[in-house]
Amino acid sequence: MDYKTQQFIDRLNKLDFSKMYEGDFFLTWEKTDDEIAAVFTVADALRRLRENNISTKIFDSGLGISLFRDNSTRTRFSFASACNLLGLEVQDLDEEIGRAHV
């Protein structure tokens, strides 16, 4: 493991982000400073891996479910790109269809 990768791991080990596991990211204003710092640290680590042609696919298979209220192409493309980066297939849900089954 190279020095820079170890720095990311060391930085994450100093942060408390344990409450994020199996949670959502809807209410970002409720996240702690440590949780936000952990998100940015992981993003930096993923960027470094990608820049060095190291696979960032942490999933062999799986779905990234999207349920967006707006029709923003930029938002949908960003989500699809992130899912692809991690090895997930995107499944778009229509909000109107989702309500019919609730």
Predicted regions mapped to residue ranges:
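Positively charged, low-complexity intrinsically disordered leader regions
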Residues: 2-77, 81
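Anionic-ligand anchoring segments at beta-strand to alpha-helix junctions in alpha/beta enzyme folds, i.e.
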Residues: 75, 80, 85-98
